[in-house]
């Protein structure tokens, strides 16, 4: 079983429009609602891959009830931690046109110390039967800054590998605990390190405690610093992928978690992450992927050793 933890889940609302133009009125062509948040999206992708998964998340109010009902309908196991009365799960809105997506994120509800204790206990109770743990997304107000570090240590005590996908202090505050892999995007990587070159920045995160870093670089694929070497993985330039990119990173995390659970070698793990991420872009909503596209992309992915720019060292 792969356990996903989403401390700040959301009800994802997606509006489809022909073309998004700021400062004008739009006629919405389609509306879709589903349980979301980064870890929930990861669980949905894992479920689509046929992997057994349990999504752990705090749920509150009528919005939280909608999330739970959606996960139940999808057949995804959910361990929901109930929040106090009057506390409601947030919403996100994605406006998607033929070219790109614009996403609006509500702030999460403030969690109490009791909420955190219950969430931590829920995760701890699942670890003895877990093969991998995924920690995804922002920490809502009220959670301690070292919440992810605490969960990483709990997992390591049980011999469970951890994939962390977070930004800012939620990422940097967990590095010393030694997550098995962290998956920032290019912006998050630079923000965490202050280093412009992605390879040097990834090495800096390893120096800070991460055991591996897999950075998503958009159309340039993935850059990875791992115990087995430094790698770049991407589709060939002629394999143009267009669609909704909002769930691409979560699909990559799902592939990495599955690979860690199976102890897959890093080059193969990265190939699956690139192929699954591209297939997610071709699906209409986050947490989904096109299975045929996934199978078609996989043999096209090129995984090659990564080398630093001429004249630079791999890390500071």
Language-model segments: which ranges?
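Structural motif
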Residues: 1-3, 102, 131-132, 212
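Glycine-rich phosphate/adenosyl-contacting loop at the front of the ribokinase-like
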Residues: 1-56, 65-66, 239-241, 307-316
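Hydrophobic anchor at the start of a short beta-strand
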Residues: 2, 51-54, 78, 162, ...
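Short, conserved phosphate/pyrophosphate- and ester-handling motifs at nucleotide-, phospho-/glycolipid
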Residues: 46, 185, 249
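Conserved N-terminal subdomain of the carbohydrate kinase-like
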Residues: 48-131, 296-316
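Short beta-strands and strand-loop turn motifs
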Residues: 103-105, 130-138, 165, 183-186
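Conserved phosphate/ATP/ADP-binding segment of small-molecule kinases
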Residues: 146-231
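Conserved phosphate-binding/catalytic region of the ribokinase-like
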Residues: 172, 198-316
